[in-house]
Amino acid sequence: MVAATASVTTVDGVYPSPHFEGAEKRIEIDFHANETNARGLREVTRAQLDECMAAAHCEIVSVRSNAKFDAYVLSESSLFVFPTKLVLKTCGTTNLLAGVPTILKYASQVGMESRRVKFTRSSFDKPDLQPKLHASFDDETVFLEEHFGHLSPGGGSSYILGSKLKGVQWHLYVSGSACQWQDAQPKASLEVCMTHLNREHCEKHFYRKEETFVSSAQTTTDSGIRSIFEDFAIDDYVFEPCGYSMNGLNKLSATDSQFSTIHITPEDGFSYASCELSNVDV
């Protein structure tokens, strides 16, 4: 993940360290299956996906695919494209929601219509640095209602979980009628978000080419991540000057839609890590 520098001036001329927002915004859009287009969203071209990501203020740096889906490592987190599902997860000051209209446009061009959406994020460390669409959860909800409110009778639902006085809160917006997916195979997801990371472990995720850095694959092994996801084909990336991202595709079955993804912001003072395992059969 690429660090972002905020332009800040102070009275005494002392400048704070650049801040990077590790907390991710995540949107998961399910689409109706198209009987005449089995590949569905996977028919959206790379150039079109690049345009979608540019609108969200990020870019694709790597891709790995199997029979079920395509997994993209982004400059800020990850994108997963299935025939009937798209998962976009971005951190920093990316403008995730700004990419939604372009995503829906190209989905429509390949005959795909949305049926359900789920948007989630935790509290931002520096909300004042976020783009206008993400300035507040109210702003995000207004945008989501405009684009997905019609999927539920009476509109979508938004929730804020946890107490603001006790720290981090979890923000959730969902829209889509339950009857639209009640016959689908149930899936489970686990997402763990962490702050105040161990400094010694964070050192493994700095790109120091002249000192200890060998390769992204070696970083994945040395950090212990590979041992956690031994059954996954891992696409990993270490950023300059620091930061780490990986996508994992379950390699035990070529037809498995299960994926994992990890993103680490190692800088002291605003360190952050997230680990997600999704599409696990229940």
Language model: regions and residue ranges:
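Polybasic/polar functional segments that serve as interface/processing modules
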Residues: 1-282
